[in-house]
């Protein structure tokens, strides 16, 4: 009887464990949403890239600390290093620029900080003129002082979405949550639209458009309805592309940004408009990071009649020295920073070698979007 009871208890425990595991919420895959359709680029003869196996898109989220002039001096040194790599190895960057990082150039009371941030803008302009691309990035609503300045210069008429409601949310340290759930749809669109116009003005002198956005926190909502709201906001702000669909819970084992090569491009139907998604290539730590172990040769394996796009993600601010980090003891040592610089340059060497072997074709997001749209 005692043996039978133990057996019954064990069976009951297994049943409870099975029921519990089945009842856990499965992370939604945005690439499976009905309004998201995977896009596959067909190989075309007679193009500069026709003989290559894959496109290579190197992106970085430009979100430095800009609390003091010395912070700015440090990130400017990092930008100079990044620019030197690009020029030396002929591999351009696509910078997703956090517009709020440039705001002090226009709203800071500290004149030294203001002038220093003006210099960052000059650096980014020079890099854009040397073949780099600059697109929009935000982690929260656009700086309120900057937004008011921009509104006085050019008033936009923005839509308001009905049926806005709060709900359980998978991760709250993100642009989408802070802008949409914190302030509403109209403020979400306002940050996007004015942020887009701001970068077009200060980086491109209003001669080129900023077409793409990458959301801070890699977040586009808790479910398919949120994601559709998100893409509606991008469209209403005049943006035509996004880079950063993600699956799972931020920081958890199920966290994944983007998708595998050949599956990370998509079109998104938003009413009568069509948006383009160019997601990162998934990899260790959620996405392909140029300083973490990876095999670009394997990732670029030939897909018959298809030109896959490998999208890497880096954060140049990770090489920055800041007063705040020094004070709280979180600043990485000079040796650690130098080691990371060496890893980044080694990545550039590898890509250059694969380019010479006609495996990878380096490209910016702006150039890729032009190819996708047939321009």
Q: What are these regions, as identified by a protein language model?
A:
Residues 269-290, 308-375:
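Active-site and substrate-binding clefts of carbohydrate-active enzymes
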Residues 20-21:
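C-terminal motif of bacterial Sec signal peptides marking the signal peptidase cleavage site
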Residues 69-70, 97, 104-109, 145-149, ...:
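A short acidic (Asp/Glu
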Residues 1-10:
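Bacterial N-terminal signal peptides that target proteins for export
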Residues 71-82, 110-122, 185-195, 225-233, ...:
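Well-ordered, non-membrane alpha-helical segments in soluble/globular domains
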Residues 92, 96-224, 248-251, 311-316:
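Metal-dependent polysaccharide deacetylase catalytic core of the NodB/CE4 family, i.e.
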Residues 33-45, 158-160, 204-322:
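Active-site-adjacent pocket scaffolds in enzyme catalytic domains
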Residues 30-130, 308-313, 319, 351-359:
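Active-site beta->alpha N-cap acidic-glycine motif
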């Amino acid at each position: 009887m005692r043996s039978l009871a133990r057996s019954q208890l064990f069976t009951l425990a297994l049943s409870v464990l099975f029921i519990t595991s089945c009842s856990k919420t499965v992370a939604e895959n945005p690439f499976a949403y009905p309004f998201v359709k995977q896009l596959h680029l067909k190989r075309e003869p007679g193009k500069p890239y026709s003989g290559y196996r894959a496109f290579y898109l190197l992106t970085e989220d430009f979100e430095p600390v800009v609390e003091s002039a010395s912070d700015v001096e440090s990130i400017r040194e990092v930008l100079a290093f990044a620019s030197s790599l690009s020029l030396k190895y002929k591999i351009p960057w696509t910078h997703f620029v956090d517009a709020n990082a440039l705001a002090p150039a226009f709203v800071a009371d500290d004149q030294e900080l203001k002038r220093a941030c003006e210099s960052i803008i000059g650096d980014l302009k020079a890099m854009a003129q040397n073949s780099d691309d600059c697109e929009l990035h935000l982690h929260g609503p656009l700086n309120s002082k900057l937004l008011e300045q921009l509104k006085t210069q050019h008033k936009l008429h923005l839509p308001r979405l009905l049926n806005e409601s709060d709900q359980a949310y998978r991760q709250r340290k993100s642009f989408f949550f802070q802008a949409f759930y914190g302030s509403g749809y109209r403020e979400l669109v306002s940050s996007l639209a004015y942020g887009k116009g701001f970068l077009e003005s200060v980086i491109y002198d209003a001669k080129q458009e900023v077409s793409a956005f990458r959301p801070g926190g890699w977040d586009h909502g808790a479910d398919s309805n949120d994601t559709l709201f998100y893409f509606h906001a991008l469209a209403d702000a005049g943006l035509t592309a996004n880079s950063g669909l993600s699956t799972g819970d931020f920081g958890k084992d199920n966290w994944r940004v983007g998708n595998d090569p050949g599956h990370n491009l998509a079109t998104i139907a938003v009413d009568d408009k069509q948006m383009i998604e160019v997601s990162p290539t998934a990899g260790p730590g959620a996405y392909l990071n140029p300083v973490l172990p990876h095999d670009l040769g394997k990732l670029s394996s030939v897909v018959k009649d298809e030109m896959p796009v490998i999208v890497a993600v880096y954060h140049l601010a990770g090489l920055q020295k800041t007063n705040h980090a020094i004070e709280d003891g979180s600043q990485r040592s000079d040796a650690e920073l130098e080691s990371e610089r060496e890893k980044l340059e080694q990545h550039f060497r590898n890509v250059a070698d694969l380019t010479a072997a006609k495996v990878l074709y380096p490209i910016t997001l702006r150039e890729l979007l032009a190819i996708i749209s047939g321009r």
